[in-house]
């Protein structure tokens, strides 16, 4: 499940947020702290994750400590789905 979350979320970031559908987002690549994703894009990403994986994310979780790379994000989703 974790690999599927990483794949789908990475593809969403590349195509819908960055508008670079062929770009590959590495699992440990910093998203927020590197400036790759801004606060507006972060909200879009959170809505995608909630809708796609049927989990609830608290606004307080939308930060670089929890949401800064695909691996962290997938771990959060897996923990919520359990």
Question: What annotation goes with each model-predicted range?
Answer:
Residues 39:
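Catalytic nucleophile serine of serine hydrolases
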Residues 61-72:
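AMP-binding/adenylate-forming catalytic domain of the ANL superfamily
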Residues 1-23, 75-82:
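Thiotemplate assembly-line natural product biosynthesis machinery
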Residues 43:
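Conserved catalytic core of two-component sensor histidine kinases
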């Amino acid at each position: 499940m974790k690999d599927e979350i990483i794949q789908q979320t990475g593809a969403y970031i590349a195509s819908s947020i960055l508008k670079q559908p062929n770009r590959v987002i590495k699992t440990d690549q910093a998203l927020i702290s590197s400036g790759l994703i801004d606060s507006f894009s972060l909200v879009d990403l959170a809505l995608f994750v909630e809708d796609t994986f049927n989990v609830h994310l608290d606004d307080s979780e939308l930060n670089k400590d929890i949401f800064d790379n695909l691996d962290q994000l997938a771990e959060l989703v897996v923990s919520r789905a359990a």
